[in-house]
């Protein structure tokens, strides 16, 4: 066959397209992924026939599917489909704009070549349409004023050239093309008063009036034709005018030019206005605007925007970040940013803001206003964009901290790629591969295995932490695994979570300042939940799957969510309670814990852990902030790629069933959003002793950042930045002329290759291991850091998730109460962030 890589890529696209055709043929309304695959694969098939042109296929692509053939969200998610195909005259790009633009598609064309039956349009029954638009931006019907408080002048400009001339917003106007004639003296130190990154175009012979405003900041002109190079002052003005005359630049004095200042006055003749909706489309939402997170019912409102309207930094042809404009001159790498993310909406436990993010030496250097201080006000001193600065465009995107999954069974290395593709940048857990022990418990037991696990993950582009086995009632072996590199220990009932083991393990933890994670005794073999709590002796401990379906004292382990020294977490199979949650759990549990259906006691053990009422209570406890962390329990009763999506599914369900939180207004869900994002970012970082390095979008922390389109928030990131470098991203056909043609999928980037993956990441170990210099002994490329400040933690240290209700559980009915109030919600029959987005 002699297949090239691009042909293999297209085979995957074809398979997805044929799958979509099969679903369409049986009357299933397609989701986003299916619709894209069908349209793109059909374009390739028609191109192969060689009978249609690119233009004809661009038109045909708009007719294949209609609104009735796709789920209601799809027309809002799908703006264009691009694919490259082989035509008789070679490889060509086909772009289908607005592919879902009619009520019904031409199904015979959609199924052309598949030999599948064409379904009747009656199969696509009308359904109750959901008017929720994924990722929509909600703005007030009002305008913003640009460049307020600046000196302004209106000048007449005539083009005497024979070709078009286009001038960008931040180009120093005195420096423009010599064939534009106007009063250059009055234009000194001025630029166009138009939206940042837009332009004014002069066709040959055009004569038009333009409004100019003064440059701000240090008021230094650089670049252009260098006729006015230097600070704006009278001396330099005369030198500039001499250069204008001597170099033949068009100049014509305009004595009666209108001059004044821009101001907060709708009638000011110098003002330029932009409607909030247009502003949001160009630069992303601003203060007071709201964004829907994916297809959930959650609305995030921008609390603060660091941008100065009219001086936004945007990159591209004719845009702002160019030499002497948004990009400064004469600032060496030492004082300019390595990378800037422009105009991003940041969703973090600290707040929901809009800002530029500056990255330097792999760290978040600053959050605020970036740009060129020579022409802009408000540029942070450590956020200078220079010739050594890379730009990541954040306009219209959401940035969050990389997620932390702190309940990982290292069963297979492939879970790493699933994790990073979903937005996870830190993994904490234990294991050695698909051994029986690792399938059930998060323990890397021996020092040799600890060394090998640290070495085997050394080049992988995530932060890693490994937990040793803590199930021992004597101390010696625990000291050894901690010195070998364990950053925590795991107590698990499958190894023994008896009071003696608990007490010994916590005693060792106090000595080494590490966290203890516990899966308590479902069997109640050595005692009930109160006996385990007594064994804690008020010492800090992290309780895994604190509801109990994932394991723990039956039926009342959930009581620990009200204990001050306990840091409780959920695992994601029970997030949230849905109509199918109970039915899937029995077999999941039997496989995970090496149980036998033929043994009655094994079945009884399994059934004792699966309780609808306690799972419902878990929903409520997460919503009130009594459960502080959500993690996966990867491949051992948990899904590593769904930590983020299931967190937001829980938030959506709870808002739908209980309404807004008291801390939220009727207009936004900011507090609920901040509470839930803390569950997989800052709180697991605090609980495990590395919040000084990762866990939030804050200055000084590792630049582990995830970028999302609002419409795909919580499902499929646009880009994952690891240690300041792009590590994983949504990229299309590698052979294509541009990066967007299908198949677009999450792919490893340069930040994962060679030595970069390790260099951009951290291996977390104990202080004892760092003192042993395990990084040198093991030959690790990764930065190695010790966890710390764990042993004095309490629930009150869990950000926005510090509630301490008194919890009771009826041992017969399993009903749960908190502070005397029944905790009960119904199961969800549908959840967001699911069928609209995923192929399977």
From Swiss-Prot:
Pathway: Nitrogen metabolism; urea degradation; CO(2) and NH(3) from urea (urease route): step 1/1. P-hydroxymercuribenzoate irreversibly abolishes ureolytic activity, but does not inhibit the ability to activate platelets. Also inhibited by acetohydroxamic acid (AHA), a chelator of Ni2+ and Zn2+ ions. Ni(2+) 2 binds at residues 490, 519, 545. PROSITE patterns: UREASE_1, UREASE_2, UREASE_3. Substrate binds at residue 492. The modification N6-carboxylysine is found at residue 490. One of its GO terms (biological process) is urea catabolic process. Its EC number is 3.5.1.5. It holds the Pfam family Urease_beta. Binds 2 nickel ions per subunit. Keywords: Hydrolase, Metal-binding, Neurotoxin, Nickel, Toxin. It catalyses: urea + 2 H2O + H(+) = hydrogencarbonate + 2 NH4(+). GO terms for cellular component: urease complex. Residues 402-840 form the Urease domain. It is an enzyme of class 3 (hydrolase). Carboxylation allows a single lysine to coordinate two nickel ions. One of its GO terms (molecular function) is toxin activity. The active site is at 593 (proton donor). Ni(2+) 1 binds at residues 407, 409, 490, 633. NCBIfam families: PRK13192.1, PRK13203.1, PRK13207.1, PRK13241.1, urease_alph, urease_beta, urease_gam. Was isolated in 1926 by James B. Sumner. It was the first enzyme ever obtained in a crystalline form, demonstrating that enzymes could be proteins. Urea hydrolase involved in nitrogen recycling from ureide, purine, and arginine catabolism. Is known to be highly toxic and lethal when given by intravenous route, producing convulsions and other signs of central nervous system intoxication associated with the high levels of ammonia formed in the blood of mice and rabbits. Is neurotoxic in mammals, when directly injected into hippocampus. In the C-terminal section; belongs to the metallo-dependent hydrolases superfamily. Urease alpha subunit family. This is Urease. It comes from Canavalia ensiformis (Jack bean).
């Amino acid at each position: 066959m002699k297949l090239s890589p691009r042909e293999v890529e297209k085979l995957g696209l074809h398979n997805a397209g044929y799958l979509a055709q099969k679903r369409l043929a049986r009357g299933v309304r397609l989701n986003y992924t299916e619709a894209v695959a069908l349209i793109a694969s059909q374009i390739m098939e028609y191109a192969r026939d060689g009978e249609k042109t690119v233009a004809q296929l661009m038109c045909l692509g708009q007719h294949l599917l209609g609104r009735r053939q796709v789920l209601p969200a799809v027309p809002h998610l799908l703006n264009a489909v691009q694919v490259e195909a082989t035509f008789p005259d070679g490889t060509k790009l086909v772009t289908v704009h607005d592919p879902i633009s009619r009520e019904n598609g031409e199904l015979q064309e959609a199924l052309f070549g598949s030999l599948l039956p064409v379904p009747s349009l009656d199969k696509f029954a009308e359904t109750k349409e959901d008017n929720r638009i994924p990722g929509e931006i909600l703005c007030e019907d009002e305008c913003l004023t640009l460049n307020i408080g600046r000196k302004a002048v209106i000048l007449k400009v005539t083009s005497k050239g024979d070709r078009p001339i286009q001038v960008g917003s931040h180009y120093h106007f005195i420096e423009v093309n010599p064939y534009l004639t106007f009063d250059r003296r009055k234009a000194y130190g001025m630029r166009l008063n138009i939206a940042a990154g837009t332009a004014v175009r002069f066709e040959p012979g055009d004569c038009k009036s333009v409004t100019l405003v003064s440059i701000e900041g240090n008021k230094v002109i650089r670049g252009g034709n260098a006729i006015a190079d230097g600070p704006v002052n009278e001396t330099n003005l005369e030198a500039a005018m001499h250069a204008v005359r001597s170099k033949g630049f068009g100049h014509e004095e305009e004595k009666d030019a209108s001059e004044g200042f821009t101001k907060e006055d709708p009638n000011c003749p110098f003002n330029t206005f932009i409607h909030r909706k247009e502003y949001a489309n160009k630069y992303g939402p601003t203060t007071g605007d709201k964004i829907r997170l994916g297809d959930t019912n959650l609305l995030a409102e921008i609390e603060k925007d660091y941008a100065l309207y009219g001086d936004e930094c945007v990159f591209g042809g004719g845009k702002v970040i160019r030499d002497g404009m948004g990009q400064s001159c004469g600032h060496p790498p030492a004082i300019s940013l390595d990378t800037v993310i422009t105009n991003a909406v940041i969703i973090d436990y600290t707040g929901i803001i809009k800002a530029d993010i500056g990255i330097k030496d792999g760290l978040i250097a600053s959050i605020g206003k970036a740009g060129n201080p020579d022409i802009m006000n408000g540029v942070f001193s450590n956020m200078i964009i220079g010739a050594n600065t890379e730009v990541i465009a954040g306009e219209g995107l959401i940035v969050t901290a990389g997620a932390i999954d702190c309940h990982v069974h290292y069963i297979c290395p492939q879970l790493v790629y699933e994790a990073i593709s979903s937005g996870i940048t830190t993994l904490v857990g234990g294991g050695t591969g698909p051994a029986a022990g690792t399938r059930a418990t998060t323990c890397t037991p021996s020092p040799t295995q600890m060394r090998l696990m640290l070495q085997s993950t050394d080049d992988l582009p995530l932060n890693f932490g490994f937990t040793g086995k803590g199930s021992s009632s004597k101390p010696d072996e625990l000291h050894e695994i901690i010195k070998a590199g364990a950053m925590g220990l795991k107590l698990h009932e499958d190894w023994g979570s008896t009071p003696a083991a608990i007490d010994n393990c916590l005693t060792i933890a106090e000595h080494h300042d590490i966290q203890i994670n516990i899966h308590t005794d479902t069997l109640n073999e050595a005692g009930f939940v109160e006996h385990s709590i007594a064994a804690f002796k008020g010492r800090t401990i992290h309780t895994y799957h604190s509801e109990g379906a994932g394991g723990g004292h039956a039926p009342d382990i959930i009581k620990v969510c009200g204990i001050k020294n306990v840091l409780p977490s959920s695992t994601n199979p029970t997030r949230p309670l849905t109509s199918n949650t109970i039915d899937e759990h029995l077999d999941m549990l039997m496989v995970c814990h090496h149980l036998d259906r033929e043994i009655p006691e094994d079945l009884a053990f399994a059934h004792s852990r699966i309780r609808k009422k306690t799972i419902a209570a878990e929903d409520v406890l997460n919503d009130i902030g009594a459960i502080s962390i959500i993690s996966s329990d990867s491949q051992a009763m948990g899904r590593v790629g769904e930590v983020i999506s299931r967190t937001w599914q829980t938030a959506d369900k709870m808002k739908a069933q209980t309404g807004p939180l008291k801390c939220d207004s009727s207009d936004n869900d900011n507090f609920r959003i901040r509470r839930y994002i803390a569950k997989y970012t800052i709180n697991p970082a605090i609980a495990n002793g590395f919040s000084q390095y990762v866990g939030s979008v804050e200055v000084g922390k590792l630049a582990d950042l995830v970028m999302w389109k609002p419409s795909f928030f919580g499902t499929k990131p646009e880009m994952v930045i690891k240690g300041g470098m792009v590590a994983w991203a949504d990229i299309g056909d590698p052979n294509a002329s541009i990066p967007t043609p299908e198949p677009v999928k999450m792919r490893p980037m340069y930040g994962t290759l060679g030595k970069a993956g390790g260099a951009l990441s951290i291996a977390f170990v104990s202080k004892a291991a760092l003192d042993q210099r395990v990084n040198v002994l093991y030959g690790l490329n990764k930065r190695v850091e010790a966890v710390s400040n764990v042993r004095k933690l309490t629930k009150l240290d869990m950000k926005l998730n510090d509630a301490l209700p008194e919890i009771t559980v009826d041992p017969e009915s399993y009903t749960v109460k908190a502070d005397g109030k029944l905790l009960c919600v119904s199961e969800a029959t549908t959840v967001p962030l699911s069928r609209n987005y995923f192929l399977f």
